[in-house]
């Protein structure tokens, strides 16, 4: 008997009819003699509606206001959990909705972006013993002052991963509106391939680079606690989706632009490779030696993704240093993706999440009025393109190919980041689709 966490996203619970269609999916897992815990998001669009309502009545620039903001936003998941519990009960399946305070899911005091400190599992274990399916409202927690907190956007993914970790689940299944993780956005690349298996680190890079299927925090948690995760479609429940795992079942190499002559050689010539100081040698077919030479550390581009949910913040300040401005930007847990210092310590650029715009507008206006900064501007017409794989940083040819292609396409690159497994380019958002299409074909991603 396995313990499976099933998480259903906003499109999966968008209306009553879709909620009813989740019942057979849950029943199918029970039929395998598995225990099931369910985590749900708010219905699609509901959280945005609640955010709009809050913004209509409040400036949201005080801590006490964000506490009430979290209470309002948490209501979406509560409705979904109760409706799904009712739908299961209608089919004679024992189920009960559970809210964060009932477990509890204890968090810190960072309203709207809370971090979970611990989860008490006694009630969940009791329900499983009684064969009652717990339907947990995702996205929410409760702090030591017994105030509701929320975990930030994508927080229901995080809830599911945390529950899986706390309960030592065998697997965490994330149900969305797509059939898994693809090598590129199928809306841009119609022939993009579904990835059957992907390792944690690759998925973490994908999620943090804009792939919207999973939240990066959820991926980080299942990686930390070594819990397999599957991404599945609610609308194609028989599709196997994508398995995110640490197990050694993932193909080691998926070549992209290796030398054809070396890879296609049909020679059977033997070559000598020294084994040790004694002079003993192995006899290897030349094609295997060439494969080791060109494949084992060859750069591999596995997939490409984009993120348009970004905000460029430019700050002019004579009196504040770069670090002081950066510290100011990160106030209220605003996350920085890129940082850039230009024009002799006078102008500083930061790339953050677009969702932080209102917070930063209030903060920077106050700083400008107090003469801490001279001016600031926002630019929302930016995006990142990220290529993810192996050996990225070590292959100069990769960067040359990318820059040559972008020059040919008249694409302007504002900033660039390189790591061993990822290259990220900051470009204008109008160029995203064209760039993805051309780079996908350039590297023959498959």
Curated annotation (Swiss-Prot):
Residues 250-294 form the RPE1 insert domain. InterPro entries: AceGlu_kinase-like_sf, ACT-like_dom_sf, ACT_Aspartokinase, AKii-LysC-BS, Asp/Glu/Uridylate_kinase, Asp_kin_monofn, Asp_kinase, Aspartate_kinase_CS. It comes from the Bacteria. One of its GO terms (cellular component) is cytosol. It catalyses: L-aspartate + ATP = 4-phospho-L-aspartate + ADP. Keywords: Amino-acid biosynthesis, ATP-binding, Diaminopimelate biosynthesis, Kinase, Lysine biosynthesis, Nucleotide-binding, Transferase. This is Aspartokinase. It comes from Rickettsia prowazekii (strain Madrid E).
